[in-house]
Amino acid sequence: MAVAGFVFCRPLFGLAIVLLVAPIDAAQRHTASDNPSTYNIGGVLSNSDSEEHFSTTIKHLNFDQQYVPRKVTYYDKTIRMDKNPIKTVFNVCDKLIENRVYAVVVSHEQTSGDLSPAAVSYTSGFYSIPVIGISSRDAAFSDKNIHVSFLRTVPPYYHQADVWLEMLSHFAYTKVIIIHSSDTDGRAILGRFQTTSQTYYDDVDVRATVELIVEFEPKLESFTEHLIDMKTAQSRVYLMYASTEDAQVIFRDAGEYNMTGEGHVWIVTEQALFSNNTPDGVLGLQLEHAHSDKGHIRDSVYVLASAIKEMISNETIAEAPKDCGDSAVNWESGKRLFQYLKSRNITGETGQVAFDDNGDRIYAGYDVINIREQQKKHVVGKFSYDSMRAKMRMRINDSEIIWPGKQRRKPEGIMIPTHLKLLTIEEKPFVYVRRMGDDEFRCEPDERPCPLFNNSDATANEFCCRGYCIDLLIELSKRINFTYDLALSPDGQFGHYILRNSTGAMTLRKEWTGLIGELVNERADMIVAPLTINPERAEYIEFSKPFKYQGITILEKKPSRSSTLVSFLQPFSNTLWILVMVSVHVVALVLYLLDRFSPFGRFKLSHSDSNEEKALNLSSAVWFAWGVLLNSGIGEGTPRSFSARVLGMVWAGFAMIIVASYTANLAAFLVLERPKTKLSGINDARLRNTMENLTCATVKGSSVDMYFRRQVELSNMYRTMEANNYATAEQAIQDVKKGKLMAFIWDSSRLEYEASKDCELVTAGELFGRSGYGIGLQKGSPWTDAVTLAILEFHESGFMEKLDKQWIFHGHVQQNCELFEKTPNTLGLKNMAGVFILVGVGIAGGVGLIIIEVIYKKHQVKKQKRLDIARHAADKWRGTIEKRKTIRASLAMQRQYNVGLNSTHAPGTISLAVDKRRYPRLGQRLGPERAWPGDAADVLRIRRPYELGKPGQSPKVMAANQPGMPMPMLGKTRPQQSVLPPRYSPGYTSDVSHLVV
């Protein structure tokens, strides 16, 4: 069953294949059969030789199977080119279009003009019939709005601008003057040069710029006015497009102005090369095969055959139009054939044949011609197609060139001016600017005039400039020998690239402002200022080698330590001070308790010495703790017990550590250097973190601003600081000094100068974005190399180092700052004012306490006087009583004595008279206080120790008056005194025989 099914399906499968393939073959056969088999090629030629060669070429083409498919035949239809363009139009219609030509090959005599070829192009283009020109080189044929179907195997004249660029690159000329006629071709070659140079120099370091464009009317009679302008320009390289007749006038007048001699370079196009007065040494271009009509005819025919062959294989070609009277004819195949023609790239007799979008020949070869004596033309180079690289290549033999003035050495191509227009800008310490007074007529010897020109009213304000860059300029002008006029930047800016409305235009375009704009627009020759070298600026201007290497850094104000009245307390934290204060009183309390409860402290043993030291009370313990802490000596009692004394020793060690730590920390905190910066550098987290309350800024539009824009990792920081940016560096630095701006990011040279001038300012962190300051010059300036070499010599000789010391590091000011930094900081009144205030408070407290004590003492004295009066009265009364008692007792004893005597001896008489000589004491009249013999003061001093119960009596006084106690202040032991009552004293006598009762 499977085999039967397969056998049944095979016919169906084969039928399907046939049905699918048949339409394709039918379509191919239909296409091939629908295309014409014969093609008429028209020719509008200038002479019979060209007509004959055209016919021969067509015949040979039919046998070339590489270009002609089978069953396809080409036929030629030719007419003679008429000088009358109208007649030419009729001939094209009647003899070419009527014969259904598919394309037309056109040539004409060079002297007949381009009107007839243009007529052929207009007529054929109206019917979309392609036209291939072999001799028309005017720029007008490149306009596809007019010549819609025109191609040519020769390049237009303005394509020589491409060769000019190659020659300038070969000779390394960077500045040129272009001379061209004001016709279509002259303006076309200028436009081609400017347009092509934009892309040509993308990969070339040295760019040729047009210094001056001189446009003249064709058929001129004199070129003198233009030569005057050319002579004042720097460039001595002239690129000229002119007809042969105009070139004769230009060369004639240039010779009279001596502008065709030594040092000048003339590069001209083909027409000017054939002038009969072309100076010796002129270089010109000559198109290869320019006059080879036969070669161009053959190449045009084969290009056409190649296009038709490809078109036949791809699509159907409709028959060409036949009637010029039918204006409704729209031959689409003709338009398609024109596109196929433009895409051709073949190797022909005239070289590599290819076309651009305008149908103009590309890859055309040129000979570089050098004019010698007697108008001899010598080929010194070729501009030809390199098949290996598939591009054009310039080859010039420099040794064979004879330059103007019969020189073998290549001219510099530029006249180096010796008087330059210089610009600068105020930027301390590089440029100081001072306005001249009304009575001043000249600047100081170390200054140079630098007026500020007002662009609005063309007035000038007189200023004088001095500084680092001015000294450099003075030395530079001497070294490389130039004079100058110095002026200030008109807008006071270095310049940045901004969008701006063009004059008279509605569109925005980018342009440079400030110093850079003046240089780019060639209103200045040189910029002598602290101009940072960066890629954005180097694209538009030249820089010398750096005269000052620097980078970017951060300026901030030095952090100042706030000095308060309690600065002396800052070495310890508040918590530590509180703990110390608490510890003093806790230790005092523990000392008191240990001494009180110790068996060897408060309580004395019964057999202990009466002179043993007393135990420590609470007030003495507090005094002891403070005395040890403050190391003031201890004048009060010390701990008596062993346990309290151990604690006292530990407390003394604690006090020693605390005092030593305080002293050391005070020295470190107040005497050592303060921290120099708050920021560690550009990578400081506070700069990168936009949430921090830290303001930083730079100068808007400056090189530093451009640096931050380039750095992706600094984009967040730049967005934050962009709103704070300043117009000038001076404003930002002032705000840093005032504390309004915390960090100013700018060139290190300027900030180092500010830091050396003001000891309160400091640069933070390391340099970043390293670059250098260079002298700016115009692109291609002849002074670039000379300035660079001079600056290198200045570095080697030490001149730049001298300028650094003189201007940037600010001489003695920097030394003073260094001295300030090296000198140890000393404590001042700000730091220690609190200590003096503390002493003052202590003095005031002492005075207050003494006043209180005096008042209290007066009150006590009054009270004591009352007590003394009462005591005196009591003592007087007591003395009287004692006296009476004594007398009575004496009488009684006398009586007893007499009784005894009477009983033993004979009775006698006792005289009561007083013997004053024998008993002087008894002869004195005694008051109550002198009832006892002796001095009253001694009597009272002896009696007071027994008056312990009396109010107001000091225990210390009582203790001091005890027998055996040390005498006050002398440390001596008082002698033992009798404490017997007066009646038992030695002054008392039992002899009372002298008393009379």
UniProtKB/Swiss-Prot annotation:
It is found in: Cell membrane; Postsynaptic cell membrane; Postsynaptic density. Residues 987-997 have a biased composition (Polar residues). SUPFAM superfamilies: Periplasmic binding protein-like I, Periplasmic binding protein-like II, Voltage-gated potassium channels. SMART domains: Lig_chan-Glu_bd, PBPe. It holds the Pfam family CaM_bdg_C0. The keyword Membrane applies. Glycine binds at P530, L531, T532, R537, S703, D747. Residues 27-573, 673-831 are extracellular. It comes from the Eukaryota. Keywords: Calcium, Cell membrane, Disulfide bond, Glycoprotein, Ion channel, Ion transport, Ligand-gated ion channel, Magnesium, Membrane, Phosphoprotein, Postsynaptic cell membrane, Receptor, Signal, Synapse, Transmembrane, Transmembrane helix, Transport. Residues 595-651, 853-997 are cytoplasmic. One of its GO terms (molecular function) is glutamate-gated receptor activity. GO terms for biological process: behavioral response to ethanol; calcium ion homeostasis; chemical synaptic transmission; ionotropic glutamate receptor signaling pathway; long-term memory; medium-term memory; olfactory learning; phototaxis. Residues 970-997 are annotated as: Disordered. Residues 1-26 form the signal peptide. InterPro entries: ANF_lig-bd_rcpt (IPR001828), CaM-bd_C0_NMDA_rcpt_NR1 (IPR018882), Glu/Gly-bd (IPR019594), Iono_Glu_rcpt_met (IPR001508), Ionotropic_Glu_rcpt (IPR015683), Iontro_rcpt_C (IPR001320), NMDA1-like_ligand-bd (IPR049872), NMDA1-like_N (IPR049873). Glycans are attached at N258, N314, N345, N397, N454, N481, N501, N693. GO terms for cellular component: NMDA selective glutamate receptor complex; postsynaptic density; postsynaptic membrane. The chain crosses the membrane at residues 574-594, 652-672, 832-852. It is a multi-pass membrane protein. Forms a heteromeric NMDA channel with Nmdar2. Belongs to the glutamate-gated ion channel (TC 1.A.10.1) family. NMDA receptor subtype of glutamate-gated ion channels with high calcium permeability and voltage-dependent sensitivity to magnesium. Mediated by glycine. This protein plays a key role in synaptic plasticity, synaptogenesis, excitotoxicity, memory acquisition and learning. It mediates neuronal functions in glutamate neurotransmission. Is involved in the cell surface targeting of NMDA receptors. Plays a role in associative learning and in long-term memory consolidation. PANTHER family: IONOTROPIC GLUTAMATE RECEPTOR (PTHR18966). This is Glutamate [NMDA] receptor subunit 1. It comes from Drosophila sechellia (Fruit fly). The lineage of its organism: Eukaryota, Metazoa, Ecdysozoa, Arthropoda, Hexapoda. The gene is Nmdar1.
